[in-house]
Amino acid sequence: MPIITLPDGTEKKYDSAVTIDQIASEIGPGLAKAALAGRVNGELIDTCIPITQNSHIQIITSKDDEGLEIIRHSFAHLLGHAVKQLYPEAKMAIGPVIEDGFYYDISYKDTFTPDDLLKIEKRMKELVNRDYSVGVEIVSPEKAKEVFTDRGEIFKLDIVKNIPKNEIIKLYKHQEYIDMCRGPHVPNTRHLRAFKLMKVSGAYWRGDSNNEMLQRIYGTAWKSSKELKEYLSRIEEAEKRDHRKLGKKYSLFHSQEEAPGMVFWHPKGWTIYRILEDFIRETITKYDYQEVKSPQVVDRSLWEKSGHWDKFKEDMFTTTSENREYAIKPMNCPCHIQIFNQGLKSYRDLPIRLSEFGSCHRNEPSGALHGLMRVRNFVQDDAHIFCTDEQIQEEVQNFIDLVFEVYKTFGFDSILIKLSTRPVKRVGSDDIWDKSEKALSEALDSKGLDWSLLPGEGAFYGPKIEFSLKDCLNRVWQCGTIQVDFSMPQRLNASYIDITGRKQTPVMLHRAILGSFERFIGILIENYSGNFPTWLSPIQIMIMGITDRNNEACFTAKDKLVDFGFRAEIDIRNEKVGFKIREHTMQRIPFLIIIGDKEEENSEISVRTREGKDLGNMSIDKFKLIIDESISKKGIQGNQS
């Protein structure tokens, strides 16, 4: 006789085992129709699974966060059902939920084309319209092995063989199609309405390049057609803002096959890069950082001591010279410790904050490379703070101020913060972990910030805080990090003399604001859609003469504006001024100056903005006040159209 306790405290008594489906039906037909799964004593189960003991339950619908994940996972199985009907020879591997949707890895002799995706999507809709029930059967690994052997599903068998014999496996049945999963899944296909298949890519089985390359079909799924439409609209807008397209359109950078994962910066793009670097340098100087420069190529012995050789050797570029093996540095931290180690340090010297715009190389897989967002050569706005245990909280507080100052400058006001704490496998005493985690959490609380806790997600050498920003499309980009490190300073013999005269190992705080310049510029390009605020625009002013006889006045105006410190260019091509205005407006240049006979006669300029606003005629000195004000707004100007 199980006693079922509902979320509002109501108790229901039953003479025998009962299911979520039955409980929902008793409460009301609307809830019964909406029920996707149940949470029973904290565990998610299918609506048809019998509950035999006293339990606290919650009925999960699409309104719950878990509901959307269940819908998406069920769509992966529906995709498998459609694929097996259309392509019976296909072998199904895995189909998990991902952000915004799902995918399924499939082995098939032919490459899936866009037309194939349309065909599969059509079949999925037909299956949904059949409004069939999704069955579930709990079996042993041995039984599952029989089922998938009969069906020739080699990848399912590979998974089953690694499941202990005493565990159970859930088989989900979409009519004649059978798949395996932890579940739960929707009880009926009527819950599967709003979806779209998006693309196909390649993926190695189990992520191992020695295994077969599979075809990964991606799909997106939502609770309603309205949400699906909104998502597809965001995707369409994101494609328009793709930094690779805009990089080409505005001649900012390019990549090419001869240097995969490396960036060819064009003059305009490099101007943005230098402005960004100068801004970060100027800002961190106010926070008492000392800039350093460390070697690009370092003997493997240092990487062995730091632990990177064992953990990251495959991701490092190496070279040999005079029988010595070197690595092109993938990160700056071991080198910064070498700088710290030069000369005796006292507790009075701490904290020491060493910063570097360090060029790093990592041997990322070619398939993972993506414009500026994922590269092999990148520059980090990297710094390492050497401090005592007692100084951690204050240093983290200062870094929080720094991060928010920088992000606000670019117009990013929505910042997500996560604190990751100790994992099971870790170095350092519980006491130092307690102190560090407390220091980080109290630093966040002291700033009145909302943050979320990720228990067990910290690195083995210390807890960390991650800062992620939301762009104008509500996409989340993880950029800033401050990471406590108890391990590396000890491995590389960093030390200082404490107040008692004893040698102690400092704590090292790894920290970055942007993450990498390349990626952050990619984020900015997409966020602004190439419409950079005046202070970041590679060309701030374009000067155009109406006729050739105005050219000299154009050069005079340019010289004066450049002397003021502005980035001004001249267009004296033999083209109509209207054509030039349209062209430079399309290039998103903030201010356009036109000089004709009238302007020249009155020692004035005619000023227009890239938004098409005519500011009228004025002196260059008056224009200087306008552009100074525009520059001072920085990211607050935030024209992201």
From Swiss-Prot:
Localization (cell): Cytoplasm
The keyword Protein biosynthesis belongs to this UniProt entry's keyword annotation: yes
Catalytic activity of the protein: tRNA(Thr) + L-threonine + ATP = L-threonyl-tRNA(Thr) + AMP + diphosphate + H(+)
Any Gene Ontology CC annotation: cytosol
UniProt xrefs under SMART domains: tRNA_SAD
Entry keywords, A to Z: Aminoacyl-tRNA synthetase, ATP-binding, Cytoplasm, Ligase, Metal-binding, Nucleotide-binding, Protein biosynthesis, RNA-binding, tRNA-binding, Zinc
Pfam families linked: HGTP_anticodon (PF03129), TGS (PF02824), tRNA-synt_2b (PF00587), tRNA_SAD (PF07973)
Cofactor(s) the record lists: Zn(2+)
Location of region: Catalytic: 242-533
GO biological process: one example: threonyl-tRNA aminoacylation
Its EC number(s): 6.1.1.3
The TGS domain, residue ranges: 1-61
Domain of life: Bacteria
InterPro entries registered for this protein in UniProt: aa-tRNA-synt_IIb, aa-tRNA-synth_II, aa-tRNA-synth_II/BPL/LPL, Anticodon-bd, Anticodon-bd_dom_sf, Beta-grasp_dom_sf, TGS, TGS-like
Residues engaged in binding Zn(2+): C333, H384, H510
GO molecular-function terms, A-Z: ATP binding; metal ion binding; threonine-tRNA ligase activity; tRNA binding
Cofactor note as given: Binds 1 zinc ion per subunit.
Family assignment from sequence similarity: Belongs to the class-II aminoacyl-tRNA synthetase family.
Task performed by this protein: Catalyzes the attachment of threonine to tRNA(Thr) in a two-step reaction: L-threonine is first activated by ATP to form Thr-AMP and then transferred to the acceptor end of tRNA(Thr). Also edits incorrectly charged L-seryl-tRNA(Thr).
Subunit structure: Homodimer.
UniProt cross-references to PANTHER family, sorted A to Z: THREONINE--TRNA LIGASE, CHLOROPLASTIC_MITOCHONDRIAL 2, THREONINE-TRNA LIGASE
Name assigned to this protein: Threonine--tRNA ligase
Source species of the chain: Prochlorococcus marinus (strain NATL2A)
Classification of source organism: Bacteria, Bacillati, Cyanobacteriota, Cyanophyceae, Synechococcales
